[in-house]
């Protein structure tokens, strides 16, 4: 993170790209609709190179999306993240092109689990200082049994807060997303 902030990788326009993933198979079409709304927010903000993934082999497309280099990576779906897991994060090769990742679905942020590190831990711990991968920040949920409609609102609110309202830190943008519940 220190190198990311003090010496950011500025080649290409990777930070002007995004990958949005929505799996409607279990949680319903609202996961796709949420990503379409986020896509509109990105477009308003000048980010129009957006890879959308709504079907097919989710894990391989998600790894490819991260490897391409994106400023934002978003997943909306269900518990299990459509088969995408820690090993997929560790197989990425995005180098210093580290996105802000949002994986706001059941159990992605369950730190201290007996089953190993959570997905968001994998995102921020992947790689090494000389060979980074994963993401610079990752936001998820800490428990099982969350609800799609609430997760969708928090997700859209995060992006609205960060990109439309100009909220500069991920924590504050997440709080903005949570405030959308009220």
What is each stretch, according to the model?
Residues 1-182:
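Cysteine-dependent hydrolase recognition
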């Amino acid at each position: 993170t220190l190198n990311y902030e003090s010496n950011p990788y500025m080649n290409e326009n990777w930070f002007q790209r995004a990958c949005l993933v929505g799996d409607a198979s279990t949680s319903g079409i609202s996961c796709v609709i949420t990503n379409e709304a986020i896509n509109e927010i990105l477009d308003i903000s000048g980010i129009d190179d957006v890879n959308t993934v709504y079907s097919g082999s989710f894990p391989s497309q998600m790894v490819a999306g991260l490897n391409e280099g994106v400023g934002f990576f978003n997943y909306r779906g269900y518990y299990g993240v459509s088969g995408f897991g820690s090993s997929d994060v560790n197989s990425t090769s995005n180098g210093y092109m580290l996105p802000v990742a949002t994986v706001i679905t059941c159990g992605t942020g369950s730190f201290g689990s007996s089953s190993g590190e959570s997905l968001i831990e994998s995102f921020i711990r992947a790689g090494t200082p000389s060979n980074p991968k994963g993401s610079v920040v990752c936001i998820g949920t800490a428990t099982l049994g969350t609800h799609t409609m609430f997760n969708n609102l928090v997700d859209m609110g995060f992006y609205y807060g960060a990109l439309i309202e100009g909220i500069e830190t991920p924590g504050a943008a997440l709080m903005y997303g949570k405030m959308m519940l009220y």
